[in-house]
């Protein structure tokens, strides 16, 4: 009899729960051995990876997959190199598991502190990029978690080939195969099962489009680490160094249009707008960026009229909204109202400006004199990231190794009794 999707996912969940107890107590050396062996396996399997990826690309082309999605799907030699380097970098990172902090004596004589421990089993749901398989697996493994990976159906062959390399790494370190499992079925019911198994899965991390993340947030019976949009702003204040501001704004938008840390709205103080916007607009136009501006912006430069919807749109494309604001207070008000609480930056040489901006902007990352595209786990020194969270509970901002752990209290005594004198 054919196994149902629910039975299949339950089997994966049960195996992951059992494996989580093993990986949770594995030594740092054992986890690093698995990561380094997986890196070597990837290096040795380049031909197999390329062949599997070509199957996915051919299917994608035949099904009319958009060029942008095909580009994300492709495993170029450089991307395989990046996956190998990523595994080795994660192996080199400090292991957060078991770290104890804030041990202190209480008046009763007991000592109280906190220890970092793995979350347990993490479900990762993502779309077309097969390199996410390595990012997710490596971070979960190093942080002592078992993981169930459900990639997009368009990358199924690539993900299977990558998973085979991870399995070789686990075997080399004598760790259970179920520490990292890739969902083999492309049936969408697998996602519904994965997000409703709290007895087996401790947290879900979705990486993909807004529709996917909204569905998971709505239907999950498991905690979710997520962000919906990356509506990021750069505010050029009246105290900005304008040449520096132009470099920052240009990099924030054009470094990569498709990342969640790309600037989508440029806010400019009215006192510097006439000096700043003409040369800024010229540079953006030469790069092919479409400009959409408010009335005050369009009185200074040529731009398409911005609508109310533009202020809350994540373009992920060479399109930029520009608004001239009265000053710092209005810039902060705009960001907190229209933004997605992801990453926002101020360009200013005035300390009072920057302090107010950092204190009042309600975002996971708040930046000073630097482009928003720096919102990245690698740039923050976290190594690879499993995603960026705009939630306020548990993890916020780029989620690296520490974000995949939690803390438990450690209490040490020497015979003290509550409410009684120690004998």
Curated annotation (Swiss-Prot):
Pfam families: Aldedh. The keyword Cytoplasm applies. Keywords: Amino-acid biosynthesis, Cytoplasm, NADP, Oxidoreductase, Proline biosynthesis. SUPFAM superfamilies: ALDH-like. Pathway: Amino-acid biosynthesis; L-proline biosynthesis; L-glutamate 5-semialdehyde from L-glutamate: step 2/2. Its main location: cytoplasm. It is found in: Cytoplasm. CDD domains: ALDH_F18-19_ProA-GPR. One of its GO terms (cellular component) is cytoplasm. It is an enzyme of class 1 (oxidoreductase). It catalyses: L-glutamate 5-semialdehyde + phosphate + NADP(+) = L-glutamyl 5-phosphate + NADPH + H(+). GO terms for molecular function: glutamate-5-semialdehyde dehydrogenase activity; NADP binding. It comes from the Bacteria. Its EC number is 1.2.1.41. InterPro entries: Ald_DH/histidinol_DH (IPR016161), Ald_DH_C (IPR016163), Ald_DH_N (IPR016162), Aldehyde_DH_dom (IPR015590), G-glutamylP_reductase_CS (IPR020593), Glu-5-SA_DH (IPR012134), GPR_dom (IPR000965). GO terms for biological process: L-proline biosynthetic process. HAMAP family: ProA. PANTHER family: DELTA-1-PYRROLINE-5-CARBOXYLATE SYNTHASE, GLUTAMATE SEMIALDEHYDE DEHYDROGENASE. Catalyzes the NADPH-dependent reduction of L-glutamate 5-phosphate into L-glutamate 5-semialdehyde and phosphate. The product spontaneously undergoes cyclization to form 1-pyrroline-5-carboxylate. Belongs to the gamma-glutamyl phosphate reductase family. This is Gamma-glutamyl phosphate reductase. The lineage of its organism: Bacteria, Pseudomonadati, Pseudomonadota, Gammaproteobacteria, Pseudomonadales.
